[in-house]
Amino acid sequence: MLQNWNELETACKDCRACGLCETRHHVVFGVGNPKAKVMFVGEGPGETEDLQGEPFVGRAGQYLDKLLAAVDLGRKSNIYIPNIVKCRPPKNRDPLPQEQEACIGWLRNQFALLRPKILVCLGRVAAMKLIKPDIKITKEHGEFLEKNGVLMMATLHPAALLRNPNQKPAAFEDFLKLREKMDQLGCDIAKG
């Protein structure tokens, strides 16, 4: 377990634990405030993220930024965003179980350094890996569950919302619940 962000990111960028390293342009380590008390976890980088080296910078990321801004959150101020896998799966497919396992240590180390009070899983893959393997995201999104002293919630992935705009109001409700929970716990570092 590495004890500081710079060492962890440097080590992660040298990772060759699975085949995804063969086709990556960049390791997409994570973005945000390393003192945040809320961590959003996605599944893995897409093409734009791989090219730029930052999570959620494509169309889905732009929509995520709108959702965040609507509840007074921002990727540079009061949250941190990594992914389950740090390298892009080919053709934007879901990361395979062995790829997730090869990469999960990086996320665990990020989690240990951040020590968030709330973890939000963006989409099915992250929710299945971190909350429970049989989660039904379309039914269980927006519900908080405590696991090892951390409140966890799944929400619909921003890319899924772009494909199914009728689900946007439900996702927005999830973000409102998150904001309310953050205010209850006093865990918004931007507010004090």
Task: State where each predicted segment sits.
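A polyanion-binding, active-site-adjacent surface
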Residues: 1-192
